[in-house]
UniProtKB/Swiss-Prot annotation:
Protein name: Probable D-serine dehydratase
Xref: HAMAP family: D_Ser_dehydrat (MF_01030)
Enzyme Commission (EC) number: 4.3.1.18
SUPFAM superfamilies referenced in this protein's UniProt entry, alphabetically: Tryptophan synthase beta subunit-like PLP-dependent enzymes (SSF53686)
Protein species of origin: Histophilus somni (strain 129Pt)
Keywords: Lyase, Pyridoxal phosphate
InterPro entries the record matches: D_Ser_am_lyase, Ser/Thr_Dehydratase, Ser/Thr_deHydtase_PyrdxlP-BS, TrpB-like_PALP, TrpB-like_PALP_sf
One record GO biological process: D-serine catabolic process
């Protein structure tokens, strides 16, 4: 498909004008069909969950703040009724059902959704090395990975990653604490405080004036020249993806504890901010495994970086970048500032994702301020992308397509997945808050 031909498409023209759009995915095929395209299944997610469990004693020792959750890194699921009322008042549109916030923004260690996938891939690599060199067995107490002799062993190896910020933060901190030498290749969008935090752990931060794609490519290139360097590939990694996917079974458990039903008459809608796609893609995969066709997964992207929407809509996936259409990929949502989506995630998930929408930067600041005022919860701009999702779902076309009745909608649960912000320094947060209009 020629780019010139694409530019004649009225929907693409809206993207090129940076208009906010909503697109209901006609390729969405139901869980039975959709899962067959992924190339992974529930046993892979279960293995990831078991690996995280094996590392629980390690976390209790290395990060004492995780002791209260017995070494399991999991985020709170909280009701945001005041925010719901404020959204209804401000947008003059109904939100039926309950509105909850999944606070991955406040996950331990790195304060973002990347504490799921990024940390998991570092653990998988550390475990592989430790098992191969007979330092541990799978039945051992993994807290011994804190011992100096094992840290010395890991220091012979290095890890590299390209990132807009949060993935680098999770991999950098986790890798450094285990003893690895870590290099994080940071794109121009990365926040200064994230670079400083990494340096405080002894991580080598390599800065670029270009965007995310360049940082990843350079990280990959640097790792190739060193046989002891492991490159974590945010664009193609199934290991990262599986780390995120464990969120599905964890959420199911939280629902059981909170008495929240998900079935035909109690649909679940989850709104996930999307950058390159690994985090939201992996979480959506886990959600579909856990809740089947009763969960609807909607991706939210900035108007200036709609890479996954563009890839899935055109079917070109990683063969097209937003810049090919003159879209600049410059956004306040630094975690979502990605011009070319993951080809792996796009192809794996295009039959499981129910919809996409875009949101302008100013709304992210407005919603950030509103959440702070109503619920006293502070997030970074990227994390607010999902907040207007429930307003889009009221669209009659969406309800018709999925045969959702008003009664089912009244029983629905909406989850806004808050992807980051828990570690933002106060000075930076005050800047964000000053940019909101209400």
């Amino acid at each position: 498909m020629k780019i010139q031909h694409l530019m004649q498409d009225p929907f693409i023209q809206k993207l090129m004008r940076f208009e906010e759009v909503m697109w209901f995915n006609p390729k969405s095929a139901g869980v039975k069909t959709g899962l067959s395209y992924v190339g992974l299944d529930v046993s892979d997610t279960q293995q990831a969950a078991e690996r995280l469990q094996r590392f629980a004693p390690y976390f209790c020792r290395a990060f004492p703040e995780t002791q209260k959750t017995k070494g399991i890194l999991e985020s709170e699921l909280v009701s945001i009724d005041k925010m719901k009322s404020a959204l209804i008042d401000h947008y003059h549109m109904p939100i039926q059902g309950r509105l909850l916030l999944k606070k991955d923004s406040h996950l331990p260690i790195s304060g973002s959704i990347k504490a799921r996938g990024g940390i998991y891939e570092v653990l998988a690599y550390a475990e592989k090395l430790a098992l191969e060199h007979h330092l541990i067995t799978e039945n051992d107490d993994y807290s011994q990975l804190c011992d100096e002799k094992i840290k010395d062993f890991f220091s012979r190896y290095s890890i590299a990653v390209g990132s807009t910020g949060n993935l680098g933060l999770s991999i950098g901190i986790m890798g450094a604490v285990l003893g690895f030498k870590v290099s994080v290749h940071m794109s121009a969008d990365a926040r200064e405080w994230k670079k400083q935090k990494l340096r405080s752990y002894g991580v080598n931060v390599v800065e670029y004036t270009q965007d995310y794609g360049v940082a990843v490519a350079q990280g990959r290139k640097a790792a190739l020249s060193d046989p002891n360097c492991f490159f974590i590939d945010d664009e193609n990694s199934t290991t990262l993806f599986l780390g995120y996917s464990v969120a599905g079974q964890r959420l199911k458990q939280q629902f059981l504890e909170q008495g929240i039903k998900v079935d035909e008459n109690h649909p679940l809608f989850v709104y996930l901010p999307c950058g390159v796609g690994g985090g939201p893609g992996g979480v959506a995969f886990g959600l579909k495994l856990a809740f089947g066709d009763y969960v609807h997964c909607i991706f939210a992207e900035p108007t200036h970086s709609p890479c996954m929407l563009l890839g899935v809509y055109t079917g070109l996936h990683d063969k097209i970048a937003v810049q090919d259409l003159g879209i600049d990929n410059i956004t306040a949502a630094d975690g979502l500032a990605v011009g070319r989506a993951s080809g792996f995630v796009g192809r794996a998930m295009e039959h499981l994702l129910d919809g996409f929408y875009t949101i302008e930067d100013q709304k992210l600041y407005d919603l950030l301020g509103l959440l702070h005022k109503t619920e006293n919860i502070q997030l970074e701009p990227s994390a607010l992308a999902g907040m207007i999702g429930p307003l889009h779902i009221n669209h009659s076309d969406y309800l018709r397509r999925y045969h959702i009745t008003q009664e089912q909608l009244a029983n629905a649960t909406h989850i806004v997945w808050a992807t980051g912000g828990g570690m933002v320094p106060d000075v930076e947060m005050q800047k964000y808050l000053s940019l909101g209009r209400f």
